[in-house]
Amino acid sequence: MAEQSSRNLDTGRAGIILAGGRSRRFDGIDKATAPVGGRPMIHRVAASLDPAVDELVINCRADQRDTFAAALSDFDVRFAEDSHPDHGPVFGLRTAVRASNAEYAAILPCDMPLVPTGFISHLFGRVQGGTGVIPSVSETPVPLPSVVHCRAGEVACTETIRAGSDRLKDVMSTLGVNVLDGREVQAHAGLDAFSNVNTIDDLRALSSRR
């Protein structure tokens, strides 16, 4: 039987940005603050989420907070600092949903700056009272971007951690999320929307397309 969360029943929508990684493939720079179109990448992600949500929650390490606060000064954000830094995105997601007051949360990584707000809104519309919804990209379900029920997501993260996994796709499997097919996804977002910026070369390629 799944463990019960101690959270109270919440309402509303949150936008969660997972940004606690070390950017080890980014030449020593925190990729969240790398410029995309003249703005820090994390600012671009926040700008995608903000119109579709009631609150923004930023998961990060304590040493990133001041830099991110400056980069996100245009937004009203809540920080959810990692209590277990460097333990991966499942710990980060659990920290973020615990910090949120929302019933559902849209989740984006800090390195996916092209997801349109309309697609985030579509995910919220498609969750339909369930535990979560994720897209299928090139016929493969992907865990981000996604919308999940915060309380159920917290429990699923805990169960995934206890099972020894640090993979978000295992969280989504535990949740039993719905998967949007590729045609529906493409109707609301181009394939470029799901591009991750993992390296400096990825950033250059992204900049050349803009």
From Swiss-Prot:
The family database entries (Pfam families) matched by this protein are listed as:
NTP_transf_3
Q: Which GO terms describe its molecular function?
A: GTP binding; metal ion binding; molybdenum cofactor guanylyltransferase activity
GO CC annotation, single:
cytoplasm
Give disulfide pairs as residue numbers.
none
> Main EC class of this protein?
transferase
Tell me what reaction this enzyme catalyses: Mo-molybdopterin + GTP + H(+) = Mo-molybdopterin guanine dinucleotide + diphosphate
Which keywords fit this entry according to its UniProt record? Cytoplasm, GTP-binding, Magnesium, Metal-binding, Molybdenum cofactor biosynthesis, Nucleotide-binding, Transferase
Looking at the keywords, is Calcium present?
no
Record-listed E.C. numbers:
2.7.7.77
What's the chief localization of this chain?
A: cytoplasm
- UniProt-listed CDD domains: MobA
Family matches, as SUPFAM superfamilies: Nucleotide-diphospho-sugar transferases (SSF53448)
The record's comment on protein family reads: Belongs to the MobA family.
Function of the molecule? Transfers a GMP moiety from GTP to Mo-molybdopterin (Mo-MPT) cofactor (Moco or molybdenum cofactor) to form Mo-molybdopterin guanine dinucleotide (Mo-MGD) cofactor.
Q: What is this protein called?
A: Probable molybdenum cofactor guanylyltransferase
Q: Which organism is it from?
A: Haloferax mediterranei (strain ATCC 33500 / DSM 1411 / JCM 8866 / NBRC 14739 / NCIMB 2177 / R-4)
